[in-house]
Amino acid sequence: MQYSIFGQKFLKQTGIGQLMDDLSNPPPGSCLLGGGNPAFIPELIEIWREIVSKQIESGSIDKILGGYESPSGILELRETVASILSDESGTKISKDQIAITNGSQNAFYFLLNFFSGNFGNDQRKKYLFPILPEYIGYTDQTLEPDSFLSFVPEIREIEDRYYKYFISLENFDSIPSWKKEAGCICVSRPTNPTGNVITDQELEFLIERANNVGIPLLVDNAYGFPFPNVVFGKNSFIHRSGMIQGFSLSKLGLPGVRTGFVVGDSETITLLHRANSVINLTSANPGQFIALDLFRSGRWKELCEKIILPFYLKKSIFTQEAILNNWSSQIDYKIHQSEGAFFFGFGLGIYLYPLAIFIRF
C-alpha cells in the first residue's frame, strides 16, 4: 500500500502511541502505573454515578446519547466555564472565548498545527518549549516534521536530595533566533512527566516574551488550575491577553469521556469550532453534560480542593518518604521537587541532568 507523507508518519511507532499501547497491553509481570490515567477515587466515582443516574431517571440521557450538539459545544456549558475562569483568574472571559473539544490532546493537535508549519511565502514556524523535559505527546502532533524548538532548563539543587527545573531566562536573549523561528510558545503546568510547576514569575515572563514578538503562549492545564488543581504549592491561575489555555475533564477522573476546554482569543476559538466540525463533526455529549451538572452546581471546587488534591499530595509524600527512608545512602540520586500532577521524577548519578526517571504515584 502506498501512503501519503501524512500516512507514512504513522507507519512507525510514536512516543505517545507506545505509551498508550503499554497502558492497554503491559508486558507480563510488569507493575502497571497507569501513565496519566487518574486513580479510581471512590468519592469521585460516587459523584459520576449520581450525575449519570439523574440523567437516566429524568430521560435526558436519550438526548445526550441520541443527538448532535453544536461543534462549538453546549452554550450553557461555555457560559459556565467562562464564568468559572473569570472568577478564578480575575479576568473577564466571555463564552466566545471558550471552545469545547474532545480532550486536551485533541485541542493541542489543532493549536500546534495552527501556530507551526507552513505559513506561506516560504516561511515556516516551529513551536518553542521554553523548558525541558516536556510532555511526550506534543512531539508527534504536527503535520510537518521538525516542528519544535526547545531550551534546556536551569537546574538548581535543593537541599541534599532534591532538585528543580527552572526556565533559563537567559536563553531568550542568548538565542535570539527563536524570535523568527517560533510561531508559539508551549508549556504544560504542572509538567508531565516531572511534576514541575513553573512559577507565577516564570509564567509572567513567558507572557511578556510571547507578546513582545506577537505570538501566543499555549498553556496546558490538564493537571493544573482551576481543575483538577493538582498543584501542591502556592502558584496561581493566571490568564492574560495573548494566552491560549487548555483544560481537561480527564484528570478530574473522567478520561473516558474525552472532553476538554480551551480559553483564548475569539478568532482562535472560532478556528477551533470550525476545525472541530471538520475532524469530529462535534464534541462528545456525555462529558459535556456531566461537566455542566458538576460546574453548575459549584461542587467542582470542593471536589478538587478536598478530595483530589489531598489524595495525590498524600501519594507524593508517601513516595518521597519511601525513597528517602529505604534507598541506600550509597546511591547517588536526587528527587525532583514534587509540585503537582501524578508524576514523580528522580535522577541517578551522572545522569541527573541529561536523564531523569519518572514514575506515577
Q: Where would I find each of the regions flagged by the language model?
A:
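N-terminal "arm"/small-domain region of PLP-dependent enzymes with the aminotransferase-like
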Residues: 1-76, 83, 87, 180, ...
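Generic structural signal for small/hydrophobic residues in well-ordered secondary structure
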Residues: 33, 81, 98, 128, ...
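Conserved glycine-rich beta-strand-loop-beta hairpin in the small C-terminal domain of fold type I
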Residues: 34, 308-320, 332-348
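Conserved core of the PLP fold type I
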Residues: 63-213, 218-240, 244
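Active-site PLP attachment segment
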Residues: 234-274, 283-286
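Short helix-loop capping/hinge motifs at secondary-structure junctions, enriched
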Residues: 266-271, 300-301, 351-352
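Structural signature of PLP-dependent enzymes
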Residues: 273-279, 297-323
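Conserved C-terminal alpha-helix-loop-beta "cap" of PLP-dependent enzymes
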Residues: 343-361
